[in-house]
Amino acid sequence: MSAKFPIISITGSSGAGTTTVKDTFEKIFKRENISASFIEGDAFHRFDRETMRSKIAEEKARGVDFTHFSAEANELEILESVFAEYGRRGVGRTRHYVHDEAEAAKFGSDPGTFTDWEEFRDSDLLFYEGLHGCAVTDTVNLAQHCDLKIGVVPVINLEWIQKIHRDKATRGYSTEAVTDTILRRMPDYVNYICPQFSLTDINFQRVPIVDTSNPFIARWIPTPAESILVIRFAKPQSIDFPYLLSMLHNSYMSRANSIVVPGDKLDLAMQLIFTPLIHKLLERKHRMS
């Protein structure tokens, strides 16, 4: 953690909806005139697409499922050094992983490859969005560097539906290919992804209120209106629950540290919750300057 150079971390699995949360933060940053440096978790994959495919095949021959969820498939030591350096001096670097042709045109690199490393511009804070924002292993502790840690955790059937639809629509994969990826990733999901949500300050869990019992044949992603949000706070004593309940129509508290909100109020809920927290981080930063 660093009062002078705060770090916000959004952690979620593939298909969890972390990009939606990032979009809301970008709105807040623009409205509040806050400059942020951004890190995409994919930028710290250890291998490009072709090398990763070879590595998966090599490990499969040994009876091992090798996936992007694991620590070994990512440069977590480098990511931790970036977090630490930003926390100390407000500097660091990142790159982009190019997913498709649209991004290839934008970044000038082939799909499945990385762009060159680039230094951060001067910024008020650092924003990370990806798989490992709160990862703790035998060799790294990313959670210790973050000033605000947020988990995005849909119930798992909904997460799978979102992943299947996204990968088919934007990456051209078949349902069978996405299903195979989900199956291969399950041990790493349990060992590397889930434990991070016990370290977050706030978790957002979208829960569908329609039938999602077989996510592999679902023709539509449940809409926000067909969902509720369970929002859990690690330190509820610092949250103004009466204010949130008054501003978020039809919300209620399910536990002393949790509030349930209609699914179509996600953006409003995040803005009401995060804006004062960001202000606190920046007020602390300015006191240290």
UniProtKB/Swiss-Prot annotation:
EC number(s) stated in the UniProt entry for this protein: 2.7.1.19
Recorded catalytic activity of this chain's protein: D-ribulose 5-phosphate + ATP = D-ribulose 1,5-bisphosphate + ADP + H(+)
UniProt keyword annotations, A-Z: ATP-binding, Calvin cycle, Kinase, Nucleotide-binding, Plasmid, Transferase
Example GO biological process: reductive pentose-phosphate cycle
Domain of life: Bacteria
Matches recorded under InterPro entries: P-loop_NTPase (IPR027417), PRK (IPR006082), PRK/URK (IPR006083)
Residue sites binding ATP per the record: G12, S13, S14, G15, A16, G17, T18, T19, T20
Pfam families from the UniProt entry: PRK
GO molecular-function terms, A-Z: ATP binding; phosphoribulokinase activity
Enzyme class, broadest EC rank: transferase
Record-annotated membrane-spanning stretches: none
Pathway field: Carbohydrate biosynthesis; Calvin cycle
Signal peptide as annotated in the record: none
UniProt similarity note: Belongs to the phosphoribulokinase family.
Protein name according to UniProt: Phosphoribulokinase
Species annotation: Rhizobium meliloti (strain 1021)
